[in-house]
Amino acid sequence: MRLLTVVLLLPLLIICHEHSHHHHDDEGSAVLTKVGLDDHELHEHDHDHDHDHKILRWDEKKNHSSHEKVPHSQLSTLKVWVFSLSAVIGISLAPCTLLFFIPAQHANGPFLKILLAFGAGGLLGDALLHIIPHSLNPHSHGAHDHDHAHSHDHAHNDHSHDHSDQLRVGIYVIAGILVFMMVEQLVRIIKGGHCHSHENGHIVADEHRHLNDDHHHHHNGEKKQEVEGLKDIKASAYLNLVADFVHNMTDGLAIGASFSAGSTLGWVTTLTVLLHELPHEVGDFAILVQSGFSKYQAIRMQAVTALGAITGCIFSLLISNPVLSAEGDTGAIMPFTAGGFIYIATVSVIPELLESGDHNNMSKVAKMAQSLVHLIAICMGVGMMYIVSLVE
């Protein structure tokens, strides 16, 4: 009987308990409603309050840690100048030293043609795989996560802004091609057309003919040929020197800004620029020799273009502009230079490779083999710049 009573009363007690608990929750909700809050708002308030505290603690920790790291990464003004200029001078001297070990050959020498093909590949790779991609995306991807929360509000504006920047880079590249074309045409008009690329074989033949005329007038003949050779230097050589000077200036800007940001970043940028400049300077040397310079004249002119790197470095250190970041974001200069490199490679260098077999009595098989070697050299130049871009 007692057991039956307990079984009958137990559900009733459970129902009363649940009703009392629900009534208590209703009273709590009513109190919150009277003060102008509901459960959802209270939850949001607690969440936001806790979130704000977390953000505050994280910001304090971040600022504290960054405050501790700054003295270790920053350099004094004197060290920044010494390190930056030393790095630029070292990068400028290293390729010039390497050029002394390249054997001197006349303009139609097979080894020089291979270097010329390597230089064409380096110019195209530098322009299309390094300079233009960098100009299209000059900023780091580290800000992606920070801006992700605002992507829904600004997606359309960001897309329009990026598209206009990409179009602007393309316009600068085209402008570089057109300006270099007009400069070469102007040089040809001023020099009376004596710098046309098809005359190179006749110039070399005339040089050998004069050398074999009379041994008694050998030294006078060499001096006369050197003077005449300077007059017959192709316009592509001058265009290449201008492009190198501007390109070296951007490298100097990058190195100066990198050492201003910290010693580690400065030396990493220096190593990257050095790896980039070594194959580039070898190709430029081949272009200058092919255009009419002697070996030592080409080396001297390469040293002159190195003044662009020193100028850019000094300019970067003087203005200390954060806009000139470690990546060397220099607006229109880089894509304009890329256009110049594309013009030199496609208009001045590659046609020389296509005509190289016409100056020699070579069989068709030998010409095909020579073309294959040139193609491999071009691919090696492009591949070198691709590797440098990946490392950078």
UniProtKB/Swiss-Prot annotation:
Chief location bin: membrane
GO MF annotation: an example: zinc ion transmembrane transporter activity
Any one GO BP annotation for this protein: positive regulation of fertilization
Membrane-protein topology: Multi-pass membrane protein
Gene Ontology, cellular component aspect: membrane
Annotated segments matching region Disordered: 139-162
Bias-annotated ranges (Basic and acidic residues): 142-162
Subcellular locations according to the entry: Membrane
Glycosylated sites: N63, N248, N361
Keyword terms, alphabetized: Differentiation, Glycoprotein, Ion transport, Membrane, Spermatogenesis, Transmembrane, Transmembrane helix, Transport, Zinc, Zinc transport
TM annotation in the entry: 82-102, 114-134, 170-190, 255-275, 304-324, 331-351, 371-391
Database matches in InterPro entries: ZIP (IPR003689)
PANTHER family in alphabetical order: ZINC TRANSPORTER SLC39A7 HISTIDINE-RICH MEMBRANE PROTEIN KE4 (PTHR16950), ZINC TRANSPORTER ZIPT-7.1 (PTHR16950:SF18)
Function: Zinc transporter which regulates intracellular zinc levels. Required for spermatogenesis in both hermaphrodites and males where it resides in an inactive form in immature sperm, spermatids, but is likely activated in response to reduced spe-4 and spe-6 function. Upon activation, mediates the release of zinc from internal stores in spermatids into the cytoplasm. The resulting increase in cytoplasmic zinc levels promotes spermatid activation and subsequent differentiation into mature motile sperm that are capable of fertilization.
Family: Belongs to the ZIP transporter (TC 2.A.5) family. KE4/Catsup subfamily.
The protein's name: Zinc transporter zipt-7.1
Organism placement in taxonomy: Eukaryota, Metazoa, Ecdysozoa, Nematoda, Chromadorea
